[in-house]
Regions:
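Charged, alpha-helix-forming regions
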Residues: 1-255
Length: 255
């Protein structure tokens, strides 16, 4: 036979292990520095990752993950505990605790909240009304959709995402929305108040995010939206294997 024997798996040398450790320490220091800078300089998301008001944006690392699923609306959402989220890049590890998020609604609500928050210093409260949110999402203006919007905001807030990658290092327990509450509920002055997690903003830093035209994006079906997330987050996308795409959608259909 022409095939050579399989090489023995390489053990990491002491030097390589030390190099890994140094790299980890550097990553942690850089992350700490970025977060301290955000605080000290009162930076906004827009300072780190600008996008136009007719656009919305998303960190590439989340665009390529199965964080927002495309499962059937009739299928009840799963409650997930330290659930490993599929990611296109093997280098990225994401675990998720919370109620399953869907591309159909949660993804859009989150992107719109980032839009509202983008010009405020990270970590300061941002207010908007359910009327504004539903209008910007292209949703009907009625109580049912206000309730739907509130459910999405609550789900997004009740999340714990652990993230690690070679580029960023480790993020411990990031929430997609750091704080959410409804002020003056039931009154004419009622509004939502949210804060964005500074750890979340780190995912955007260094130009690692994608921008897209909102009017077109929000009209896409959930599956088309996830396909778009993949392609928009790669400058030169690899052809996408169907199985990889299925996993990226968090789909549980066998086909």
């Amino acid at each position: 036979s022409m095939s050579a024997p399989a090489p023995a798996p390489k053990r990491k040398t002491a030097v390589e292990k030390t190099a890994d450790k140094v790299s980890e320490v550097k990553q942690a220091a850089l992350l700490k520095h970025t977060k301290e800078q955000i605080k000290a300089m009162q930076l906004s998301l827009f300072d780190l990752a600008p996008w136009g008001d007719d656009m919305r944006a998303m960190p590439n690392d989340l665009a390529r993950a199965a964080l927002f699923t495309t499962r059937n609306k009739k299928t009840p959402r799963e409650v997930r505990q330290q659930h490993v989220i599929f990611h296109v890049n093997k280098d990225v590890l994401i675990t998720y605790t919370g109620i399953e998020l869907r591309a159909d609604d949660d993804e859009l609500v989150w992107q719109q909240v980032l839009e509202y928050a983008k010009r405020s210093p990270v970590g300061t409260p941002v207010s908007f009304t359910f009327y504004e949110l539903c209008t910007d999402l292209g949703w009907p203006i009625n109580g049912r959709y206000y309730d739907k919007a509130e459910e999405c905001l609550t789900r997004l807030q009740a999340t714990a995402v652990q993230f690690s990658s070679g580029r960023i290092g480790r993020l411990e327990s990031v929430s997609l929305i750091h704080r959410f509450r409804v002020l003056d509920r039931g009154k004419k002055t009622s509004r939502c108040q949210v804060e964005i997690d500074e750890e979340m903003v780190v995912l955007f830093a260094g130009d690692h995010y994608s921008k897209f035209v909102w009017e077109k994006y929000r009209e896409l079906s959930p599956t088309a939206r996830r396909m778009f997330d993949y392609f928009v987050s790669h400058k030169e996308p690899f052809p996408l294997k169907l199985e990889t795409f299925r996993l990226m959608c968090g789909s549980d259909s066998a086909r």
